[in-house]
Every structure is written in structure tokens, then in C-alpha cells.
Amino acid sequence: MPRPDRRRALLLDLFDRSFRGPAWHGTPLWGALRGVRVAEALWRPGRGRHCIWELVLHAAYWKCMVRRRLLRDPAVTFPRPGSDWPRLPERTDAAAWKRDLALLEREHLLLRRAIVRLAPAALDRRAGRWTVLQNAYGIATHDLYHTGQIQLLRRLYR
């Protein structure tokens, strides 16, 4: 009987905890977004600073790009215009906010599915500058980094 790949199990654990929790460090990304309404999602602490909504789109974009790297599939594209920091929708209402939250969740689930389907040997394969494993750990820590920003923005907004 083949041994389960411990690295992939640990990676999925980190990936899941950074997005949904529970995590010893506190709130995961999805938890930090709980209860955010449109006005709060659009609020900026200053000119040229990102708002929560932009952080959500940025996180979704990079989940998509990491999936593209892992799958080596140039057909994997983000469904919104712009790269790195996709533009906000033209209408920034509650329905659009809900759609973009769903986009973040969908990109997370698609990336998770891609990680689950990877052969253990694929973890050491290059996916751009970094290995598959480094890309996947990187996106989990990317979530945590932006979770901290979102929590800070929420405190400043109040």
C-alpha cells in the first residue's frame, strides 16, 4: 500500500487553515471578511491605498495564477480584467460584493482541487521561479499577509 505524502497533507492543512481556519494565530482570510459590507469593503485609509474589496480581488487573482502555474495551463485565466490588482466592478453594490466574495471562494476551491490532484513527485517540480510546493505554501502565506491588512482596515474603519 503506498504511503500518503506527508508534505501534501501538511500543505493542505496550512492552505485550509489560512483560508477557513481554525488556526492558532487567529482569524483566517474568510473569517476576516465575515460581516464586511460594501461601504467598509470600499473604504480607503488614504489616497492611493487599497481597500478590502481590492484585497479580495488580489487574493483571488493570485490563487488563479498559482493554479495556472501548478497545472502548467496557460488556458487558466482570471475572469476579471486587470492583473495583480484587478479593477473593481463598475457597479459596487451588495450584489457585486457578494459575487466577488464568491469568486475568491471559487478560486480557492479550484486551487485546492489542483493541489489534491498533484502527484507527490510534482511538489518538487519547478512552476516558474519556485517549486510547486513553494508556490502553494506561498499562496497560503499570501492569504495570511492580506488577512492582517484586512483586519487592520476594519479596525481603522470603525
Functional labels for PLM-detected ranges:
Residues P86-D124, Q134-I139:
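Acidic/histidine-rich alpha-helical segments that form the ligand environment
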Residues P2-L33, V38-R87, D124-R158:
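Short, contiguous alpha-helical
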